[in-house]
Amino acid sequence: MLMPKRVQYRKTQRGRMKGNAQRGTAVTFGSFGLKALEPAWITSRQIEAARVAMNRYMKRDGKIWIRIFPDKPVTKKPAETRMGSGKGNPEFWVAVVKPGRIMFEAAGVPREIAQEAFRLAAKKLPIKTRFIVRPDYEG
């Protein structure tokens, strides 16, 4: 599962997801991409599940790029604990994804196979997505 090796602060504030993505909105590495249409926290488990689904369908042909990284720790207090007594311990890691962000890219496979692989990956994610083709793609 994806997570940072080291972090400056063990616990972070939740923050808010305002506006659209400013960076990572163009398909740059591959020929096809999966674009987020909604804001969300994507967990490292969801990223891994989507990656596995794509790899299985593509039968390890082509190449996949993961363009998001879970660098935000989400804390949780233990069950049946009273309120107060500090912030809970980090439980899992999330990537903050805003609308317009390219989350996954693929190359080296036909368009139909990439589209189906991204459809299977999108089922593993909690947001609406769209299949994107690089503008200069010659299929």
Swiss-Prot record:
The keyword Transmembrane helix is annotated on this UniProt entry: no
Single GO cellular component term: cytosolic large ribosomal subunit
Statement: the UniProt record of this protein carries the keyword Ribonucleoprotein: yes
Listed GO MF terms: rRNA binding; structural constituent of ribosome; tRNA binding
Annotated Gene3D superfamilies: Ribosomal protein L10e/L16
Entry keywords, A to Z: Ribonucleoprotein, Ribosomal protein, RNA-binding, rRNA-binding, tRNA-binding
One of the GO biological process terms: translation
UniProt region (Disordered), positions on chain: 1-21
Family: Belongs to the universal ribosomal protein uL16 family.
Xref: HAMAP family: Ribosomal_uL16 (MF_01342)
Protein name from the UniProt record: Large ribosomal subunit protein uL16
